[in-house]
Amino acid sequence: MAKIGSEGVKLLMADSTNSLSEGFSKSESVVDEQITDIIRAHNGRVIIATFASNIFRLKHIIESCQENNRKIITFGRSMENAIEIALNNGLIEDKTIFIDANQAKDMKHKEVCILCTGTQGEPLAALSRIANGTHKQISLLPDDLVVFSSSAIPGNASSINNVINKLY
């Protein structure tokens, strides 16, 4: 570490989540393909919960929605903040892909993707409120498809399962 620091590196960022799990995780390109397939194939709204901090994943979801003529509604403060930061820094270029919940009311369900927080079952996150029926702007529809685009952080399985059970 001292050698790297002496070479001018000022910050090392690392993620050790699931580092004790054996084997390999899927490549991000495999995940990207699966997300694109879902967005393309589903005839209803697609609700994707993912980590707001994963800008690369957000960017791919946005590109898949553009390719498949879907507009995006974002829910969750951290998601909205991450999108705004990415737009302001040129990481995401097309602001017109984003709409609000009122604009979506007049659209075909196949033309809408909802990007939200709540992959870990956090009780106040957007997905939990959607699942509980307490979200002020959106309710689940029979043809909605909910995608958890994340892995469970150890210790969160029970909270995640509670949200999944409420989605049924």
Outline where the language-model segments fall.
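His/Asp/Glu-rich metal-coordinating catalytic cores
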Residues: M1-M107, E122-S139, G155-N162
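Conserved acidic residues
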Residues: K10, V112, D144
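Conserved two-lobed SF2 helicase motor
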Residues: E111-Q120
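Aromatic- and Gly/Pro-rich donor/ligand-binding loops
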Residues: G118-T119, S150-P154
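Extracellular/luminal Protease-associated
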Residues: V146-F148
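Short helix-loop-beta junction
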Residues: N165-Y168
